[in-house]
Amino acid sequence: MLKVGLSGIHPLTQRYMLSKSVSKREFKMILNHVSVGVSDVPSAVFFYDSVLSALSIKRAHYIENVAAAYGENFEFWVGCPCENAASSGNGTHIAFNAPNKEAVDQFYVTALELGGECAGKPGLRPEYGETYYAAFVRDVDGNKLEAVFM
């Protein structure tokens, strides 16, 4: 059985933490931030402002027509690529924590309403963990996004 206090952490990571007696407070992410390239920054900012607000994630910074950052520590960025046109990474996706299942559902609905594509309807994903509830979408540039509640 998993210890209380590990919600929001992937089940495989939870197992590792428990096997090594690592607390959530001691656990450090290896990434500082992630960014995705978009073809139209203002349109992408509207899309991400709307979709991420369903997960209680707010835009924290904006450089007009260049990039926008989300999260308290600017963990997620959308922006125009420095070189060449924006293209999505095959096999890449960004997963955002959701506060509850309803937020996952709202993330999915909002993304589709704004021109995103379904990449996996909201539902339980027992192959990732007993309580892993997620939805997958692609933004208008083809970037794959996930909202997950555990």
Where are these regions (language model features)?
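Core segments of cupin and vicinal oxygen chelate
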Residues: 35-76
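Residue-identity detector for glycine
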Residues: 5-8
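Short, flexible turn/loop "capping" segments at secondary-structure junctions
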Residues: 26-29, 84-88
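Vicinal oxygen chelate
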Residues: 38-42, 96-140
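Long, contiguous binding/interaction regions
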Residues: 85, 102, 114, 145-150
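Short, Lys/Arg-enriched N-terminal segments with co-localized hydrophobic residues
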Residues: 11-28
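N-terminal beta-strand motif that seeds the catalytic metal site of vicinal oxygen chelate
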Residues: 23-45, 94
